[in-house]
Structures are given as C-alpha cells and as structure tokens.
Amino acid sequence: MKHLTEMVRQHKAGKTNGIYAVCSAHPLVLEAAIRYASANQTPLLIEATSNQVDQFGGYTGMTPADFRGFVCQLADSLNFPQDALILGGDHLGPNRWQNLPAAQAMANADDLIKSYVAAGFKKIHLDCSMSCQDDPIPLTDDIVAERAARLAKVAEETCREHFGEADLEYVIGTEVPVPGGAHETLSELAVTTPDAARATLEAHRHAFEKQGLNAIWPRIIALVVQPGVEFDHTNVIDYQPAKAAALSQMVENYETLIFEAHSTDYQTPQSLRQLVIDHFAILKVGPALTFALREALFSLAAIEEELVPAKACSGLRQVLENVMLDRPEYWQSHYHGDGNARRLARGYSYSDRVRYYWPDSQIDDAFAHLIRNLADSPIPLPLISQYLPLQYVKVRSGELQPTPRELIINHIQDILAQYHTACEGQ
C-alpha cells in the first residue's frame, strides 16, 4: 500500500497531482469523505492529531487503535476497500506534554509513536518543534531534529515488530502558527524561507544518520512548511504564488520530497489547485469540513422551525449555545471581544471551535431529534432552496435525495470536491 510514495513519484515526474488529508473524527464528515472517495475511486487519507487521539484517549476519548477500528468499521459498512484507506498521525511528538520536563514529555512521545504505529497508521508526521517545560524557547533545529530521529527509530522498530517490515512514510517539520487556525486576527503571514526549509531538512538528515536511519530517507515524503495560507475567525489569507515562488522552486532539487500545507481550509478552488502545482501537494483540511457540517445543521434547524411546532423542535442551536457556555474550555481562549462578538464566533467562526462539542450527549441528542423531526415527511423544496440552495439544484436534477442526512453529507462533499479537483493532476 504505497499510495503516498507513488503519488510523490508521479508528482516529481510532472503530473502536478496531490492528495488531500481529511483531519476530522466526526462520523458524518468521515462518511462523506469515504463515500466521496468511493464514488471517485481514489485512495483516502484520514489523519488524527496528537490532540484528538493518543495513548491516553486524547480529547476524543479514542486511542489510535480505537480510531483505526472506528474508521475501518465505517469504511467496511460503506464497502470501501481498506487497502485504499491511509491513516496518518499529525503533529506526533511532545505536543500534548509541553508542560512537563523534556525527558518526561519525550518518554510520552515514544509511547505515542508506538501506539500509532502498532495500530496501523502508515503516514507519520514527526513534530518535535515545541519547547517543553525545561527547554529553551525556541528550540534549535538540531534539538528538534534529534528528537524527531529518536521517534523515527521507535517507529521503525515498532513497525517491524508488529508487521514484519518497516513501510512507514514520514513527514517532518512544522508550520507557524500552531495547528487549527490562528488565535488572533491576521493581516500578514511570513512564508517559510528556502533557507529555513533547507536547514530543517539538513538538520533532520544529519540526525537520522546519527541514529543509523539513512535508509529511510526516501520514505520521508514531505516537509511541512508555511506557504502563506491561514485563517482566523472571520478572515482568510489567500495563497499568493509569487510570495512562495522561491520556496516552491527549492523543493525541485529534492528527488523524493514534496511539501505538506496545513491550514488550507477556506482557500479558493483556484488557490488549492495552484498550491498543488507549486509542490504543496499534500493539502490538510479539517475545520472547513466541520464548518460545512455546522452550516448544514444550522440550515436544517431553520427549516425545522418553519415546519415543526416550537415545543416539538430539537432546539439544536440553543442546546449547542448552552453547552458551549457551560463548558467554555474549547473556545474561551480563542474568542475575544464583547458578548455579542463571542456569541457570533461560537456559532460562525472559521476556526470552528464548535467542532469540539458535537460528541456531547446533550448536543448529540438534539441532533438526533432534529434528524427525526425532518425525516418524518418530505422537506418542502422551497425551504431547501431557501436554506441549502446548492443542494436544491442537485435535488431538482434528481442526483440528490432530499433527506436530512443526505443533504448534510452532500454539503460536506462540496468542500471535498474542491480538494479532489485540486489534487487530480494532469
């Protein structure tokens, strides 16, 4: 199952192709992605982050083995072949344990890597860029690379132990700012310089040599860089190819390497395509998919209010708001301003902190109630036209069933389609 190295080989041969990575644990987002990949007969890359999934459960409550089981069960139920499914681990390193001394944090990171590799994750992003409690800020390239090489050695040994061979594919480096969208309002963004990218690569090459890992260098398929794309709560910094031209040209000197771009959410279809052409050929997308999920659910909640007596409504939006106010830990440090500004951000921000709340039992019950209310009888076409106009066109042409679930899935797939088109190549 060498989908990624084959993709890189084709890209380096001039095909201008790429692959997108679905970074979400939401069942409806994953179903939308699996069904879309199945319909288009493409492999599907699904990634878990070190915050979502770790050996202790992460914020989803899932270990890597749990996450793999969950995704594979869903794929099986949708008749998606498991050999077309690639699982990746994102920002694997001491990220979750920055408040601990480095020795302790890295011991946890060793176990994190073991748990991901043993569970069958094949794309491993080694990211040791964050300073721990007793570290200098920022870390030098050499320290970052030494720690990454240590984790690579653990990964290789674990893979051989569990699967008889080491067939992992690695991504190294990190982007600025932190994953998941910027905390503050953005105006300008520094593109990674070619010198910084080269320094990261050379530091890692040297550190891998010291660990006796020369042979795995061709399996280091991508370097994470900042090509100048980001989003905050209400704005998107669009890709400007001219600003990334020197960086784009620099990677052409490396035979088996492309770039991986994070925070590509909300870029225009044209920008996504240009990113892939410019060798930022692994596109990460997460918040934009749960943002589309939220859009569809808010639209269905508005339709519900038109059709169902108030006392029988799910009250999804109010339940969501109440839970977010009761448990503000996932948005409080991100959303600023007066009460109204924070209220708007909770519901509508591009950074989509609401995605952390969908698993809550009260919210999940309200979601199920909403779906039941709208599944009992056909949704009137004029209301679909009003609240989900893109889906209305497909319903009218006969290509989409106007059930609540299908409307949600299709709205998410509209975003996936942009990524698929960007990655198709010539």
From Swiss-Prot:
In Swiss-Prot or TrEMBL terms, this protein is called D-tagatose-1,6-bisphosphate aldolase subunit KbaZ
* Pathway(s) of this molecule: Carbohydrate metabolism; D-tagatose 6-phosphate degradation; D-glyceraldehyde 3-phosphate and glycerone phosphate from D-tagatose 6-phosphate: step 2/2
Q: How does it assemble?
A: Forms a complex with KbaY.
Question: Which source organism?
Answer: Escherichia coli O6:K15:H31 (strain 536 / UPEC)
What Pfam families does this protein's entry cite? GatZ_KbaZ-like
GO terms classed as biological process: carbohydrate metabolic process; D-tagatose 6-phosphate catabolic process; phosphoenolpyruvate-dependent sugar phosphotransferase system
Q: What does this protein do?
A: Component of the tagatose-1,6-bisphosphate aldolase KbaYZ that is required for full activity and stability of the Y subunit. Could have a chaperone-like function for the proper and stable folding of KbaY. When expressed alone, KbaZ does not show any aldolase activity.
What domain of life? Bacteria
A single GO cellular-component term on record: plasma membrane
- InterPro entries noted in UniProt: Aldolase_TIM, GatZ/KbaZ-like, GatZ_KbaZ_carbometab, TagBP_ald_KbaZ
**Sorted alphabetically, which Gene3D superfamilies does this protein's record hold?**
Aldolase class I (3.20.20.70), putative tagatose 6-phosphate kinase domain like (1.10.400.20)
Q: Which family does it belong to?
A: Belongs to the GatZ/KbaZ family. KbaZ subfamily.
